[in-house]
Design a protein with these regions (language model features):
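Active-site glycine/GP-rich loop and adjacent strand/helix microenvironment
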Residues: 1-141
Length: 141
C-alpha cells in the first residue's frame, strides 16, 4: 500500500505483526518500519510479537524492544547448547514461558534469535538460519 500511496496518519497507531511469510522479499524490520513510517506519515511503527501456541503477546512501542506482560517471560539460550541459558545482552535462541497457557504447554522454544534487555524486555534479531517459515496464514496452502 505504501509503495504506491502516501498517507497523513500522524494521529494513528500503526502496528506491524510479522514478516512477509515467504510471500514477498523479506525486509529487515528497521527498513520495513522506515518505509511504513514514511508512507503512513507517522513517527513510529509499533510491533506485536506472538504466536498461535501462546495466549500472550509482547508489544514494542516503536523502539525495537518488546515488553512482556508479567505472566510471560522470555529467555535466551545458546544456539549450540540448548541447556545453556544466556544473560542480558547476549544473542541466542528465544524461549518463552507463558503462564496464561496453564491448561496447555506453557514453554515454547522458538527458532527466533534475540537478545534480553532489562525490565522484562527483549529484541528479536531474526530467524535461525535454515529454520522453517512460520505464520498461521501459511496453513492455507
Amino acid at each position: 500500500l505504501v509503495e504506491q500511496y502516501s498517507f497523513d496518519l500522524k494521529h494513528t497507531l500503526i502496528m506491524e505483526t510479522g514478516g512477509m511469510k515467504g510471500r514477498r522479499k523479506e525486509l529487515i524490520r528497521e527498513d520495513l518500519h522506515e518505509q511504513l513510517a514514511t508512507g503512513f506519515g507517522v513517527e513510529h511503527i509499533h510491533s506485536e510479537y506472538g504466536m498461535t501456541e501462546l495466549l500472550s503477546q509482547a508489544y514494542s512501542k516503536g523502539e525495537g524492544l518488546f515488553s512482556c506482560p508479567p505472566w510471560m517471560q522470555v529467555f535466551t539460550r545458546d544456539t549450540t547448547d540448548p541447556f545453556t541459558f544466556l544473560t542480558e545482552g547476549m544473542m541466542g535462541n528465544l524461549n518463552i514461558m507463558d503462564l496464561a497457557n496453564r491448561e496447555s504447554c506453557a514453554f515454547i522454544a522458538t527458532q527466533d534469535l534475540g537478545r534480553l534487555h532489562p525490565k522484562n524486555q527483549f529484541e528479536v534479531l531474526g530467524r535461525v538460519d535454515h529454520s522453517d517459515i512460520r505464520g498461521c496464514n501459511l496453513l492455507v496452502y
